[in-house]
């Protein structure tokens, strides 16, 4: 498996997109390590992908879903989470950040393999890098169609079975503030690479099904127009937008420093991005909902946005709520 550093990744993406060659890419959180391969050269034993209806998975190599499914997370103690939370929130109260995405790594006991999770998960975006990780993400990073770039930051989660769940989510002041901040950040990000940037849909609700029930999430759509020659510069465009604002915070550079210090683990490809270019259009995802294989054991990486209105108990519970597989 060939991996590229930042400079060579930009060159490779520009080269392939400029020639209209279909390819898939994975870029890690620190955007210093990338997998880039033409679609007709991808070995399915190495990489399986699904971007909407675009996939290299063939049902001839299907796996049998274990029954019953064993899924037993062991979250870090609340006291440990609280320490990282206070480190982040203190920076927010000092004015160093307005929004910070704090994440954790959680061991999970399961009878599911990476292939099992890829094959049987219900998600818009799925990635399985053999012996490394599987991702089943609901979140789009950017889409590009006919020169229009669109982003869909996703912020705000609630259990769908709660009374008035949708109303509670939309009326939650903390969620409102977090969503407004990330919308402003992404709008500014897109303005670095596009013009006529605008918010076309604000805080719309999607329903997701998990192995432990349904959840509601709010997203916003932001669009802009790219220059006519964007294909030749697709690599530069992508890397200028990294890391993704929805999984870092605002202001992005300082907040990234804050969360790296507080988290005390390597995100790796978690919260990086993955994308599929078909020769004309691009679809890409933020790699959240992420299970990693380390020394034969599974680890789930999850987190959430911290603002000045956040409290540690609620954020800890949200982090745990996201430790699921969408298999049902």
Say what each PLM segment does.
Residues 1-328:
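Extended alpha-helical targeting/anchoring segments
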């Amino acid at each position: 498996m060939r991996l590229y550093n930042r400079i060579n990744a930009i060159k490779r993406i520009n080269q392939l997109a400029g020639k209209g060659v279909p390819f898939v890419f994975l870029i890690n959180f620190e955007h210093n390590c990338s997998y880039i391969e033409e679609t007709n050269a991808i070995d399915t034993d190495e990489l399986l992908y699904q971007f909407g209806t675009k996939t290299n998975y063939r049902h001839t190599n299907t796996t049998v879903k274990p029954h019953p499914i064993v899924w037993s997370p062991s979250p870090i103690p609340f006291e440990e989470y609280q320490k990282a939370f206070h480190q982040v929130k203190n920076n927010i109260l000092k004015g160093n950040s307005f929004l910070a995405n704090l994440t954790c790594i959680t061991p999970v006991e399961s009878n599911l393999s990476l292939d099992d999770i890829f094959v049987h998960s219900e998600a818009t975006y799925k990635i399985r890098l053999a012996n490394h990780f599987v991702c089943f993400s609901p979140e789009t990073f950017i889409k590009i169609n006919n020169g229009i770039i669109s982003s869909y930051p996703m912020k705000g989660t609630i259990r769908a079975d709660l009374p008035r769940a949708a109303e509670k989510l939309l009326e939650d002041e903390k969620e409102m503030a977090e969503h407004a901040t990330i919308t402003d950040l992404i709008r500014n990000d897109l303005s670095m690479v596009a013009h006529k940037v605008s918010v076309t849909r604000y805080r719309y609700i999607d329903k997701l099904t998990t192995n432990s029930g349904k959840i509601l999430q709010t997203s916003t759509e932001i669009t802009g127009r790219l220059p006519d020659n964007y294909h030749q510069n697709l690599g530069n465009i992508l890397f200028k937008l990294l890391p993704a604002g929805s999984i870092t915070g605002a202001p992005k550079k300082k907040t990234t420093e804050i969360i790296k210090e507080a988290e005390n683990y390597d995100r790796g490809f978690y919260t990086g991005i993955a994308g599929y270019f078909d020769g004309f259009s691009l679809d890409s995802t933020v790699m959240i909902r992420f299970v990693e294989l380390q020394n034969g054991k599974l680890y789930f990486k999850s987190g959430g946005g911290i603002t000045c209105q956040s409290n540690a108990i609620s954020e800890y519970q949200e982090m745990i709520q996201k430790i699921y597989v969408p298999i049902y």
